[in-house]
Amino acid sequence: MRYLATLLLSLAVLITAGCGWHLRDTTQVPSTMKVMILDSGDPNGPLSRAVRNQLRLNGVELLDKETTRKDVPSLRLGKVSIAKDTASVFRNGQTAEYQMIMTVNATVLIPGSDIYPISAKVFRSFFDNPQMALAKDNEQDMIVKEMYDRAAEQLIRKLPSIRAADIRSDEEQTSTTTDTPATPARVSTTLGN
């Protein structure tokens, strides 16, 4: 019986490892991006802190922006915008619910390669109770903080796709630089009037 339990446990581990399952909130950051520079206009702002935290959770070593190393990829955080749209109204016409939309733009600079723009968009709804103004403000602050965290997660999840695009770009460059024999000019087969 013990042998059967060990066999089933081993089989379960192999199946989950083989299908690519991984723990929540972790991303397989490419090995070429395990050391990175985080560049932001507001290094102590909420987005910078959230991105820095996500990078560290995923095992990325962060270097100082003023480092002399030029062979390290750089994640540059750009503009953050938060929009608030009315989602529903009370009978008297006052806003009952808002939909908050956070848009974050960033670029990844890979030395010797290209600059890859990435963006993240996070949506959250927020109920507006006019009778609880203080609680409403606190709830909105908590929602915005959570939106920064989700946007940071989305940005980090896009790093593997940037690496794949970089590899494709390198392959296209090598295929265009190889010598190919000249092909005959295209001949039109239509009859002119």
Swiss-Prot record:
Coiled-coil spans in chain: none
GO cellular component: cell outer membrane; transporter complex
Pfam family, one: LptE
Molecular function in Gene Ontology: lipopolysaccharide binding
Lipid sites, type S-diacylglycerol cysteine: C19
Biased composition (Low complexity): 174-186
Region (Disordered): 166-193
Keywords on record: Cell outer membrane, Lipoprotein, Membrane, Palmitate, Signal
Protein purpose: Together with LptD, is involved in the assembly of lipopolysaccharide (LPS) at the surface of the outer membrane. Required for the proper assembly of LptD. Binds LPS and may serve as the LPS recognition site at the outer membrane.
Assembly notes: Component of the lipopolysaccharide transport and assembly complex. Interacts with LptD.
Protein name: LPS-assembly lipoprotein LptE
Originating organism: Shigella dysenteriae serotype 1 (strain Sd197)
